[in-house]
Amino acid sequence: MEPQLILGSSSPRRKSILQYFRIPFTCISPSFEERSVPYQGDPVAYSQELAVGKAESIVQDHNPEGVILTADTVVIYKGKVFNKPGSHDEAIEMLKTLSGQTHSIITSVALLQQKKLMVGQETTQVTFNKLPEEYLGRYVEAFSTLDKCGGYSTQEGGGLIIHNIQGCAYNVQGLPIRTLYHLLLEFDINLWDYLV
């Protein structure tokens, strides 16, 4: 019997990564309000709380029978969280701050089915090139970065801004396959069985 997997996300990047496999899934956007959770100084705990909150909101709103998969990605630099920018100007300020620097990207993945909850996370280090400030506005406009934490995308124009990625590149896109693989095994779902 095919597993019932529910991707609790409106992210086209997460959907695209999951589509690398033949595993059937449906998408439900969580109603969880991310901005309602204050950052308390622990980026892993923060990311996990957001991922679990998304999964729990899907249970509350839809009560599906399948395995709910949610994730949350945060950018951390010098102890500060860079979520999705609220405006064009905020995205530019984020890029200025990260220019020429190394920051961390933490993605927490939560799987929830009935009362069974499994959570894991992945951390990746990303180093930016020194960015020419006069082009940052064009970058934000060209690649619609307001829906991306940190105000940037590795897939769209990433080569212009990223010097180096240490760790899982899928983590930077919002869904670390290695972490997902190990968590799905806890629900008797093996991604190796769903290779295209």
From Swiss-Prot:
Signal peptide: none annotated. One of its GO terms (cellular component) is cytoplasm. It catalyses: dTTP + H2O = dTMP + diphosphate + H(+); UTP + H2O = UMP + diphosphate + H(+). The keyword Ubl conjugation does not apply. GO terms for molecular function: dTTP diphosphatase activity; UTP diphosphatase activity. Its EC number is 3.6.1.9. Its cofactor is a divalent metal cation. It is found in: Cytoplasm. The active site is at D72. NCBIfam families: maf (TIGR00172). This is dTTP/UTP pyrophosphatase. It comes from Chlamydia felis (strain Fe/C-56) (Chlamydophila felis).
